[in-house]
UniProtKB/Swiss-Prot annotation:
Pfam families: eIF3h_C (PF19445), JAB (PF01398)
Covalent link Glycyl lysine isopeptide (Lys-Gly) (interchain with G-Cter in SUMO2), residues: 303
Protein name listed in UniProt: Eukaryotic translation initiation factor 3 subunit H
Stored SMART domains: JAB_MPN
Organism ancestry: Eukaryota, Metazoa, Chordata, Craniata, Vertebrata
Amino acid sequence: MASRKEGTGSTATSSSSTGGAVGKGKGKGGSGDSAVKQVQIDGLVVLKIIKHYQEEGQGTEVVQGVLLGLVVEDRLEITNCFPFPQHTEDDADFDEVQYQMEMMRSLRHVNIDHLHVGWYQSTYYGSFVTRALLDSQFSYQHAIEESVVLIYDPIKTAQGSLSLKAYRLTPKLMEVCKEKDFSPEALKKANITFEHMFEEVPIVIKNSHLINVLMWELEKKSAVADKHELLSLASSNHLGKNLQLLMDRVDEMSQDIIKYNTYMRNSSKQQQQKHQYQQRRQQENMQRQSRGEPPLPEEDLSKLFKPHQAPARMDSLLIAGQINTYCQNIKEFTAQNLGKLFMAQALQEYSN
């Protein structure tokens, strides 16, 4: 991975956010230094991602694209991006890999950073903790260690607060995905829970001095009355949709728990039958020995009692992580609106 010296003539503004089904990055093994400790994004990249969704995003449809940039020490600098074009099943001749190579070749010809450092995806009410995202990020991170995925929430952004978060798979989850063993025993041995699947990387949005001056001038020109709109309560549809999605995921988790409990009951019942069979064989051999007869021949118990296939638990972890994300969204929504109510009450009392 190439790197370059830090540029001058620009400033950075921090973009903080809280994670849903994620924890703070703890590096390799969950306690060491992470490969990337900070993500620095050019303001132009943020605008491109937002523009991409506004042009092609519809309802639950997500938009995706490639992130380009460089690595400077433990900081990932994202300096450019380009979208994946929307195509249907009829576009059988479309080759995504070839498209990416041609785009990066064109960027290299015009002397623009063209190193692949990750990808971005929009989300619908925070519904991004899926198996598809896990598999995609594993492929990126396995090939390029510093890769990140940016999650853009257009619904939260439309309410006046930019929602852009950077995630990476934790080292523990990377090891489990490499082994491709998602059995209950393997996940228990790796000490993997939904809180240790993703790590959130802090984001800093970088703008040039000219852009910062322009934003300062716009801030000065804005009327004081315009700022009172910040006290407007958010739509209850947002809360209702999050609750509906939360209930759907809880139903899925309930079905998954029923399947796992059925497996445990069947396994326990089979172990009892196996133990009873061994005891009967032992008693019969003792009786044959007392009569001077040879013992019964050894039998392969694995053929008589075929073990039940343990259900994969990765989907359960993803569902639990998504449930946690919805709970965090609901918590943020209610906290912000309660704060606005108290501020509006204080302003009213002050004006009276």
